[in-house]
Amino acid sequence: MFPMLTEFMNYGQQTVRAARYIGQGFMITLSHANRLPVTIQYPYEKLITSERFRGRIHFEFDKCIACEVCVRVCPIDLPVVDWKLETDIRKKRLLNYSIDFGICIFCGNCVEYCPTNCLSMTEEYELSTYDRHELNYNQIALGRLPMSIIDDYTIRTILNLPEIKT
């Protein structure tokens, strides 16, 4: 008779322990119910990127001296720099500069090590296309400045959202 009593006590303890675990999980769920949602309605609302966000690279053609430091520091040798040596002035003249963003890993080494600061990172991150060849940007496409999210009147940013009272 005593073994049956101890089994019943073990069953009761297990039931209490299971109820405690379920209660702990329920309390965690309830603690998250008061928080605001993290998701946003993406095409219509956008997050404002941080100051050091590494988005699309902006290139200033006039500042580039065709030193190819960006190619040497790139872990995948991505930037394509075409130049011609001007013999009369003994300097390189930049002919073409391009970056394929389908391959770029956005490490920022090219921007950091550029001696003339002709490269900079923008806050543009929407680079998706249906054709991967459209991701190969030449110096004209790299020279375009993106529209700032804050200046875009068609998009509600998180700063402009109405506050939800809790």
Curated annotation (Swiss-Prot):
Keywords: 4Fe-4S, Chloroplast, Iron, Iron-sulfur, Membrane, Metal-binding, NAD, NADP, Plastid, Plastoquinone, Quinone, Repeat, Thylakoid, Translocase. Its EC number is 7.1.1.-. PROSITE patterns: 4FE4S_FER_1, 4FE4S_FER_2. It is a peripheral membrane protein. Transmembrane segments: none annotated. NDH is composed of at least 16 different subunits, 5 of which are encoded in the nucleus. This is NAD(P)H-quinone oxidoreductase subunit I, chloroplastic. It comes from Bahiopsis tomentosa.
